[in-house]
Amino acid sequence: MKIAIPITDENFDEVLLKARNADILEFRVDSFTNKDISFVSGLLKKAKENGFETILTIRSEKEGGAYVENRVEMFEKLMPLSDYTDIELSSTDIIAYISRLSKEYNKKLIVSYHNFEMTPANFVIKETIREALRYGDIPKIALKANSYEDVARLMCSAIDIKTPKILISMGEFGKISRIAGFIFGSFISYAYLEKPNAPGQLSLEEMLKLKEMFYLR
């Protein structure tokens, strides 16, 4: 079980201290104030020096991110410095290229899919996971849960996928998935330090308490 904290470049040294009990820092580069490649490179190296794994994420506008003009160049230059890279399944114009890059650099590629409105039918979830695995190593499926049944359907739809995966039910109903997902093979859960980055996200403090309560390793 690994806990990831999405971060920007704001108060970076303070974040390193506050996040010391987390495992991974997700660099949301699309939300950085300073997107200079050499600057971001320096922060990635500093995170590694402080014992964190890192996820490079440059989220697209259509999945909740901000526009980045030189997005592909940033992937090219920064991927070698990060343990994982996250690319949206919906980024159809560049996903095949990013997939090839990840293989060249021998880096793990997270292929993510977000639905902020609903949890689709089970066969749609399974097909989305299969499509994600065409390009990457780790499917990340984040769906809005409008009932506890939606949470259960997501978890059960992916239970036969034996490769590493990330399963998230968003919203109030989905809060339980942030910790229960580990039981169904989800190996990363995202938490926050100051304010949630996604609906239903738990704080790092809450996640650590739940991890201890349920003896999750």
From Swiss-Prot:
Query: A GO term (biological process) for this protein?
Result: chorismate biosynthetic process
- Name the InterPro entries on file: 3-dehydroquinate_DH_AS, Aldolase_TIM, DHquinase_I, Type-I_3-dehydroquinase
Known catalytic reactions: 3-dehydroquinate = 3-dehydroshikimate + H2O
Q: Could you say which enzyme class this protein belongs to? A: lyase
Molecular-function GO terms, alphabetical: 3-dehydroquinate dehydratase activity
Q: Does the keyword Protein biosynthesis apply?
A: no
What does the entry list as the binding residues for 3-dehydroquinate? 26-28, 59, 178, 201
Q: Does the keyword Lyase apply?
A: yes
Q: Name one Pfam family in it.
A: DHquinase_I
Q: Which residues form the active site?
A: 114 (proton donor/acceptor), 140 (schiff-base intermediate with substrate)
Description of how the protein assembles with itself and partners: Homodimer.
State the family it belongs to. Answer: Belongs to the type-I 3-dehydroquinase family.
Full protein name: 3-dehydroquinate dehydratase
Species of origin reads Hydrogenobaculum sp. (strain Y04AAS1)
